[in-house]
Amino acid sequence: MLKMESTQQMASSIINTSFEAAVVAATSTLELMGIQYDYNEVYTRVKSKFDYVMDDSGVKNNLLGKAATIDQALNGKFGSAARNRNWMADTRTTARLDEDVNKLRMMLSSKGIDQKMRVLNACFNVKRVPGKSSSIIKCTRLMRDKIERGEVEVDDSFVEEKMEVDTIDWKSRYEQLEKRFESLKQRVNEKYTSWVQKAKKVNENMYSLQNVISQQQSQIADLQNYCNKLEVDLQNKISSLVSSVEWYLKSMELPDEIKTDIEQQLNSIDVINPINAIDDFESLIRNIILDYDRIFLMFKGLMRQCNYEYTYE
């Protein structure tokens, strides 16, 4: 027992297969012509055109409608099939079909496809022979009917037409082509020479720039070595200065608390980084000057309490 929509599904499958065949034909034709293409774009354009033609011409609805009629007949519903049979046998339907055929003929004529071409295409088919340049011409059923009705004539007369051959001065043509070739060759050589000169100039500028860069890199390396040497010398000088001050501090008759405080400040000096070491020395000198100022103020106050005067010499 067939399903109710089996014929409609087959018709839809045939339509979809026809669309896929159209896409394959379009892409294979583009490949044979050596044209690059985007498959998605070709697929979209062919689908849009195919859907429009099938829908606008009514072919899709006609096929699906006939398939639906067949499904109904297969399932025991012959009313639609009877109506279609009566419609096909109606004189009005025949007149409409005849009118459509006439419209199609006029449309073909407007496209440049005249009666001779239409008749010949309807009477003959060409079959290609694989692997050969020759082909086989096959007569259609229409051609057989015309032969049976005596509508085919054989023309045995042979008309010899003289073929007019234009005399071509190949020598002058060759000379013209040779002049054009020499002119083109000269222009190409001039452009090539100009390009070579520009390329040489660019190479010279590039080599000159490379030499300048190399010299600058050498100078930078020398300056870097000099800076490293200065930094090492400063580190050694700062370390020697700290050691000398510590030794001198130990030889002084200062209290141990003061010596310890000064030693801590000396030990906090950054011997590695000269910039930080200078800042540390500045802080140490400021502290020493501040302590000296305080001692001087204390000494000045003490002398006033003892009714003494002081002078600088």
UniProtKB/Swiss-Prot annotation:
Transmembrane segments: none annotated. One of its GO terms (cellular component) is host cell cytoplasm. InterPro entries: NSP3_N_rotavirus (IPR042519), NSP3_sf (IPR036082), Rotavirus_NSP3 (IPR002873). It comes from the Viruses. This is Non-structural protein 3. Its main location: host cell. Homodimer. Interacts (via the coiled-coil region) with host ZC3H7B (via LD motif). Interacts with host EIF4G1. Residues 208-313 are annotated as: Interaction with host EIF4G1. It comes from Rotavirus A (strain RVA/Cow/France/RF/1975/G6P6[1]). Pfam families: Rota_NSP3.
